Amino acid sequence: MIGDILLFGTLLMNAGAVLNFKLKKKDTQGFGEESREPSTGDNIREFLLSLRYFRIFIALWNVFMMFCMIVLFGS
């Protein structure tokens, strides 16, 4: 059960980091413009953009998960 949850999270994180989304960064606001609350779409966009910067960590996590699958969750 816990192995399935860890595998699901790993695959989801890989999908977000590897897929090449054409996301644009949010425009910066100039003087005199009121700041608004970020929408859900803005939050998702920022999360996917931040995943791109963590590709090395994600690769190390994948190696760790493969080790766990062989040693701990293997039958």
Swiss-Prot record:
InterPro entries: SMIM7. It is found in: Membrane. Residues 75 are cytoplasmic. The chain crosses the membrane at residues 54-74. Residues 18-53 are extracellular. Keywords: Membrane, Signal, Transmembrane, Transmembrane helix. It comes from the Eukaryota. GO terms for cellular component: membrane. Residues 1-17 form the signal peptide. It is a single-pass type I membrane protein. Its main location: membrane. Belongs to the SMIM7 family. This is Small integral membrane protein 7. It comes from Bos taurus (Bovine). The gene is SMIM7.
